[in-house]
Regions:
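Residues at alpha-helix termini
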Residues: 18, 37-38, 59
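C-terminal non-catalytic regions of proteins with extracellular/luminal or membrane-system context
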Residues: 1-10, 29-42, 54, 83-221
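Metal- or metallocofactor-binding catalytic centers and their adjacent structured scaffolds
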Residues: 77, 81
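Short acidic/histidine-rich active-site segments
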Residues: 1-6, 14-26
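Conserved, charged catalytic cores of large soluble enzymes
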Residues: 50, 54-74
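Charge-rich, acidic-biased intrinsically disordered regions
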Residues: 69-76, 111-115
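A local structural micro-motif
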Residues: 23, 42-43, 64, 154
Length: 221
């Protein structure tokens, strides 16, 4: 996918030599061929295995009373874990540019416009390698919950995430005028674009054939 190697054994050998001791996919199934072709040595494989199992033993995975085998289901989505998840989400936010806009003061705002294909899309929240939560809160829902009845919240999807129209019988850009109207009637606009797991993920980005991406005019692609 990255055009660095030409075969799977070459990829496996390169990864092992660069210190990648474990692979969750199927690339390391080609390590034997890489060894037979002289791309790696038995010592390379032994070193990776020793480091991997040293870590697993230090974590206690092979202890007689391994704590990971006795985690009760009751702790799933418990208040403590939800609080930790929320804290992790807060700390992971990256603010690239502000110019004094944030934080928003709802006491000074009468109308908030929320625009974008990911503004009210749960698929954009879950990523890949995910479990199933009992509740999802989209950006639109989060803003609505926070401001309550104090601030009016307008919403426009604006565009489809990767098609040129939202409605099958619509014309290209069929929701763009709605987005413009929402923006004109809002004191501040929260624009939510980006991708979701239908368009990006492990070994997916390179083969994305729909040409999707963020465009200044909301027309995707």
């Amino acid at each position: 996918h990255h055009h660095i190697t030409t075969t799977a054994p070459e990829s496996a050998a390169l990864a092992i030599k660069m210190g990648c001791d474990v692979n969750c996919g199927n690339t390391y199934l080609h390590l034997l061929r890489a060894l037979e072709d002289g791309l790696i040595t038995e010592d390379d494989i032994t070193t990776a295995a020793e480091r991997l199992f040293t870590t697993r033993f230090m974590l206690g995975e092979f202890d007689e009373n391994c704590e990971y085998n006795s985690i009760p289901y009751e702790v799933v989505e418990c208040p403590e874990h939800l609080a930790l998840s929320e804290e992790a989400a807060r700390r992971s936010v990256v603010l690239l540019k502000n110019d004094g806009i944030l934080p928003l003061d709802k006491a000074k705002i009468k109308t908030i416009g929320v625009i974008g294909p990911n503004a009210n899309d749960r698929m954009a929240l879950i990523g890949n390698y995910h479990g199933t939560a009992s509740r999802y809160i989209t950006v639109l829902e989060g803003i609505q919950d926070y401001v309550g009845d104090d601030v009016r919240v307008l919403y426009a999807e604006g565009c489809h995430l990767y098609k040129d129209r939202v409605e099958g019988l619509g014309l290209p850009g069929d929701r763009l005028s709605e987005a413009e109207t929402v923006a004109e009637h809002s004191d501040v606009v929260v624009l939510v674009t980006g991708l979701n797991e239908n368009l990006e993920g492990e070994e997916m980005d390179q083969s994305n054939s729909v040409g999707s991406g963020d465009k200044a005019n909301l027309l995707l692609p």
